[in-house]
Amino acid sequence: MSVRAVGRVLSMALLLIICLPAWAICRLFGGGDFWVRFYLGCVAWLLGLRIKVEGQPVTGKALYASNHISWLDIPAIGGTVPARFIAKSEIAGWSLIGWLAKIGGSVFVRRQKRSEARVQADAVTAALHEGRPLVLFPEAGTGDGVKLTPFRASLFAAANEAGVIVQPVAVDYGTRSAEIAWPDGARFANEVKRMLNRPAPVRVVLHFLDPLDGATMDRKQLAARTHAEISGALGLS
């Protein structure tokens, strides 16, 4: 790894050593969310992300539905809003990454098991009732930064059943989107190294678009509407 990459890794490790005890103490009193957001925000900055927020993020019981370009989307969004992430179940077993995801309150789902779609939606519904926003990447994978892939509708059922707001979120790296994108089939470790070695800061705009009433739309309508709104914000429609 380059000197830049080593410096970033050491800085993130030191930051974790500082934040983790503070998070643990706050958890004893039912808190800790601030430290998760603070850590992710610092990680985003260390990785060269310069974040601009457009629109007003909703708070409380809500589902953010976002396009997914890179693993950098997670510190970008998680460092901006106090939200938990819906993640594929495999991540729970990824040593350090899985451990950090659990600390952050991620909800793990098995998306490949269509037979368990009802169970997964129920788990997300229960998490929404806890009052902290959830982030869903309905493409169920990363895009190429040029176009949106179709949104999977199954987990939108949770928003309908919980009767919560669904807010489309467009993550936009501008002309750098294709460069930042996680290529299909690329290994996670290789993508981490690539981003750690990347020299120049990159501007990312988080567009928090007009919220939708999840109680009045079914899962397919929510998937179609959020896809259309995000496509429009990114200039892809």
Please provide the spans of the model-predicted regions.
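Catalytic-site beta-strand/loop segments enriched in glycine and acidic/polar residues
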Residues: A127-F156
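Membrane-embedded segments
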Residues: I74-A123, L128
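A transmembrane-helix-recognition feature enriched in membrane-embedded lipid enzymes
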Residues: M1-K52, W99-G104
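Conserved H-X4-D acyltransferase segment
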Residues: V36-S89, L100-A101, D144
